[in-house]
A protein has these predicted regions:
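Acetyl-CoA-dependent GNAT
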Residues: 3, 7-74, 80-84, 150, ...
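Conserved GNAT acetyl-CoA-binding A-motif
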Residues: 90-102
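Conserved beta-strand-loop-alpha-helix junction that forms the acyl-donor binding cleft
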Residues: 100-109, 121, 125-132
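Generic C-terminal helix-cap and adjacent flexible tail
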Residues: 159-165
Length: 165
């Protein structure tokens, strides 16, 4: 398996839309708003002609937010390759940090990002509860591993410190 990561092209959009729908992340609730993940730019991972991963991102002033990151097969390096691509992109855009929001039940994501240098930056207590009540009532009460889904966690990677450290 040879994974290639590249910026998505217009002709990739239909496949990205299907991929995000399959991972139930075409529209995501975070920080009190719904965001259509099909609209921002994306990095894609391909194995030959097969789409095996998508990372969508948004820039804010001097930071790059990882909006979504999903792969077809975990534990094969695809997510790491996409995240490394986003890090290179963020540096080329002169971003000082990368950040993302995940939920309190997503222990796999917490492990993944922390092992790649991200740290817990902020807790948004009750954010998922508020999103469920006001934005998307289909957000489940119970998430991964039977954990009650309540809070959003913000993780960040300071790019300046990485370059000097």
């Amino acid at each position: 398996m040879t994974i290639m990561v590249r910026e998505a092209l217009p002709e990739d959009q239909a496949a990205i839309d299907v991929f995000l729908e399959l991972h139930d992340t075409a529209v995501v609730a975070r920080l009190g708003e719904l965001v259509d993940a099909r609209l921002p730019p994306a990095l894609i991972a391909v194995d030959g002609e097969r789409l095996v991963g998508v990372l969508t991102w948004i820039t804010h002033a001097d930071s790059l937010e990882v909006l979504t990151l999903h792969v077809t097969d975990q534990w094969r390096g695809t997510g790491t390759a996409l995240l490394d691509g986003a890090r290179r992109l963020a540096k080329s855009l002169e971003c000082r940090r990368m950040w993302l929001i995940t939920t309190n039940d997503n222990t796999d994501a917490l492990r993944f990002y922390q092992r790649r240098g991200f740290r817990l930056a902020r807790l948004h207590p009750g954010a998922v509860d508020r999103s469920r009540a006001t934005l998307n009532p289909s957000i489940p009460d119970i998430g991964d591993h039977g954990i009650q889904l309540r809070d959003e966690l913000e993780l960040e990677l300071e790019l300046e410190l990485e370059a000097s450290g």
